[in-house]
Swiss-Prot record:
It holds the Pfam family Ribosomal_S15. PROSITE patterns: RIBOSOMAL_S15 (PS00362). One of the primary rRNA binding proteins, it binds directly to 16S rRNA where it helps nucleate assembly of the platform of the 30S subunit by binding and bridging several RNA helices of the 16S rRNA. Forms an intersubunit bridge (bridge B4) with the 23S rRNA of the 50S subunit in the ribosome. It comes from Albidiferax ferrireducens (strain ATCC BAA-621 / DSM 15236 / T118). It comes from the Bacteria. Keywords: Ribonucleoprotein, Ribosomal protein, RNA-binding, rRNA-binding. This is Small ribosomal subunit protein uS15.
């Protein structure tokens, strides 16, 4: 679980306007922060399949949100993936 201070910083950095917590950009950024925090755990605990299922669920949800954002506003999608470094 990410700390509330880190979560607040992620929301502040990706909010479209003050108080924005539900936009796709914020949701994707929060999921990315949680995914990045979990990755070292799976490097050391390779057989944690139950936890991996939760990780894959988060990755899938992030992918769906990104697909939604891409269909609604491609410019915001491109800016977000560049900001978060999701595509190479």
């Amino acid at each position: 679980m990410i700390a509330s201070s880190i979560k607040a910083a992620v929301v502040k950095d990706n909010a479209r306007q003050p108080g924005d917590t539900g936009s796709p950009e914020v949701q994707v950024a929060l999921l990315t922060a949680r995914i990045n925090e979990l990755m070292p755990h799976f490097k050391t605990h390779a057989k944690d399949h139950h936890g991996r299922r939760g990780l894959l669920r988060m990755v899938s949800r992030r992918r769906k949100l990104l697909d939604y954002l891409k269909s609604k506003d491609a410019e915001r999608y491109i800016a977000l993936i560049a900001k978060l470094g999701l595509r190479k």
